[in-house]
């Protein structure tokens, strides 16, 4: 079955003879939905088309989830199967079951080229429990489904930071590898944090201060970046840590988000990596939704809310970004949903596409990239969210570690 052709530490579709085989494919098609159950953005569904096209000679059983228990959009996979059929150009059969008799009968009766989508895997209570790979392999879902399939492929990078049943459990008992989405995510992000050409610049923003500081610490400690340019709320935290009086309104916002303790953490990073961390020289204040430029030196206790980086900072940052060979962007530079305060984010995006290798970490900045129509100008736009952040922060992702363990297991078997 195996024909290992990769020098990487995980298997891909190319390493398997898939013809006539039954493939269990874990994808991430979790999508925003309206109150009538209509999918509002099908980007994640479309992202898996390349994987499915490369599996046309096999029988494909799709495992996926939608939302989580308690949420209004926690619903069936029927609309996802419908859209997937449209984009794939062939029938994707929705199966109202996960591992019961009906699901197993449907799998057993499949022919080459067939694609079925099982029910929302989170309808099963054990799915979302965080447990070891061995423990997940000992669950009913794995025991019931594994005998009916030949190969497991994880194409759900966005949930691979969770040690969930359908993400890691099957890797213990089946030959396992990465789908095309997972493969591209791992190769691109690895290049972004380790093997990209220099100079390498990370531009971190948004409102998730702890995430940005985790990434900053990792890439500067391990040499993954030459410079980290801070924007957004994390820049405000770092400015406060550096001794700047950013104003009561901005400090109150930081406290309201639970990030007051991150000021001390930022202070430590600035002391350790002072010349490698870029801070704004000026900012844009929100005066009744009007943009007012202000140098850092003029900020005081009565300062208005900071909603963007200033014009001088935009010039400095974009010059540095344009001269970089590798650029990683995560999080907007300001309150980009308000037009006057989207300037910093938009200019940074436009500068990043001029680098040799550019990555968007996902989240709100991806929305702005799409708004500018520049998606195809980036080397990679991550679908990962929290998984992407954890990867950039140097943390091990259970789903990825499970694929590495499966690779090692079948490499050892090959030697026998």
From Swiss-Prot:
Name of the encoding gene: pgk
Residues of the signal peptide: none
Cellular component GO terms held in the UniProt record: cytosol
Pathway named in the protein's UniProt entry: Carbohydrate degradation; glycolysis; pyruvate from D-glyceraldehyde 3-phosphate: step 2/5
Catalysed reactions, as listed in the record: (2R)-3-phosphoglycerate + ATP = (2R)-3-phospho-glyceroyl phosphate + ADP
Assembly with partners or alone: Monomer.
Binding-site residues for substrate, renumbered to this chain: 28-30, 44, 65-68, 122, 162
EC category name: transferase
Family designation: Belongs to the phosphoglycerate kinase family.
EC number(s) recorded for this UniProt protein: 2.7.2.3
Superkingdom, natural source: Archaea
Keywords: ATP-binding, Cytoplasm, Glycolysis, Kinase, Nucleotide-binding, Transferase
Main localisation: cytoplasm
Pfam family, one: PGK
Compartments where located: Cytoplasm
Name this protein carries in UniProt: Phosphoglycerate kinase
The UniProt record lists the keyword ATP-binding: yes
Gene Ontology biological process terms in this record: gluconeogenesis; glycolytic process
Chain sites annotated for binding ATP: 337, 362-365
Residues that span the membrane, as ranges: none
